[in-house]
């Protein structure tokens, strides 16, 4: 089944679920997308798919009614990052992200680049610490803080720069909501329904646990994309979240 929409970003879902599209072939990605309902989730397009298929893939998803999180994690000099973020806004994406480790001037430039878009601007989110990273990984980079401590420091900088929220692990969510307030959005990868394999994520939670922790948007990949019945899997996840709420 194929759903269509009259605008590039129609925000027709209240679900916090964002499905990560990780496909090597465009046709397979769209075949999967045509099995699910834009009322049940949003979609995330990352570096590999965007490099392979470009902006047209985003348009194809939008034409099917889906809001798109463009997960390119921009990290460059302020002017270059600002132009990239503005280009994403021109594309009509729902959310775009940058690396908080790019610093305050870079994040402020990205924020200012979205001002002309007004209410049509995408959510601007910063990545703190990748969920695959552990304390030993940070130590290798010369960071002596734990992942949780480093993520909180970067999240505070992100809020000070006026961004909409951060990507963080579910374990940080409770503390972040208390520290930064309900309006500061938390986007969390590593969310897997009970019984799913951990994959390459280290700090994981179930959707129900993530919701209880204060996560606003939860990124779920293979448990949905590799499901025999992805539409039903999404409905089951959303039903469990409504019960939790």
Swiss-Prot record:
Q: Catalysed reaction per UniProt? A: orotidine 5'-phosphate + H(+) = UMP + CO2
Tell me the superkingdom of the source. Bacteria
Q: EC number(s)?
A: 4.1.1.23
* Molecular-function GO terms, alphabetical: orotidine-5'-phosphate decarboxylase activity
The annotated pathway is:
Pyrimidine metabolism; UMP biosynthesis via de novo pathway; UMP from orotate: step 2/2
Q: Which Gene3D superfamilies match?
A: Aldolase class I
Q: Which GO terms describe its cellular component?
A: cytosol
Which residues does the entry assign to the active site, renumbered to this chain? Answer: 73 (proton donor)
- Kindly state a single biological-process term from the GO annotations of this entry: 'de novo' UMP biosynthetic process
Binding of substrate occurs at 22, 44, 71-80, 131, 192, 201, 221-222
What's in the keyword line of the UniProt record?
Answer: Decarboxylase, Lyase, Pyrimidine biosynthesis
SUPFAM superfamilies given in the database record: Ribulose-phoshate binding barrel
The UniProt subunit note reads as follows: Homodimer.
* Similarity field: Belongs to the OMP decarboxylase family. Type 1 subfamily.
Q: What does this protein do?
A: Catalyzes the decarboxylation of orotidine 5'-monophosphate (OMP) to uridine 5'-monophosphate (UMP).
Name the UniProt record assigns to this protein: Orotidine 5'-phosphate decarboxylase
Q: Which gene encodes it?
A: pyrF
């Amino acid at each position: 089944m194929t759903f269509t929409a009259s605008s590039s970003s129609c925000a027709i879902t209240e679900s916090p679920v964002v499905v990560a599209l990780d496909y090597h072939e465009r046709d397979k990605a769209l075949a999967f997308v045509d099995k699910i309902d834009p009322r049940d989730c949003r979609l995330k397009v990352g570096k590999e798919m965007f490099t392979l298929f470009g902006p047209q893939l985003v348009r194809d998803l939008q034409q099917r009614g889906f809001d798109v999180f463009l997960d390119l994690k921009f990290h460059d000099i302020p002017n270059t990052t600002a132009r990239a973020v503005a280009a994403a806004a021109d594309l009509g994406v729902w959310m775009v992200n940058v690396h908080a480790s790019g610093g305050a001037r870079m994040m402020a430039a990205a924020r200012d680049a979205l001002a002309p878009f007004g209410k049509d601007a995408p959510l601007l989110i910063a990545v703190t610490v990748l969920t695959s990273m552990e304390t030993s990984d940070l130590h290798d980079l010369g960071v002596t803080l734990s992942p949780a401590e480093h993520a909180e420091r970067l999240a505070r900088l992100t809020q000070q720069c006026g961004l909409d929220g951060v990507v963080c692990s579910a374990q940080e969510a409770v503390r972040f909501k208390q520290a930064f307030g309900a309006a500061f959005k938390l986007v969390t990868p590593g969310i897997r329904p009970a019984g799913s394999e951990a994959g390459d994520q280290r700090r994981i939670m179930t959707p129900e646990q993530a919701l209880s922790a204060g996560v606003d948007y939860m990124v779920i990949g293979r448990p949905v994309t590799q499901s025999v019945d992805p539409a039903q899997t999404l409905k089951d996840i959303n039903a469990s979240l409504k019960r939790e709420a």
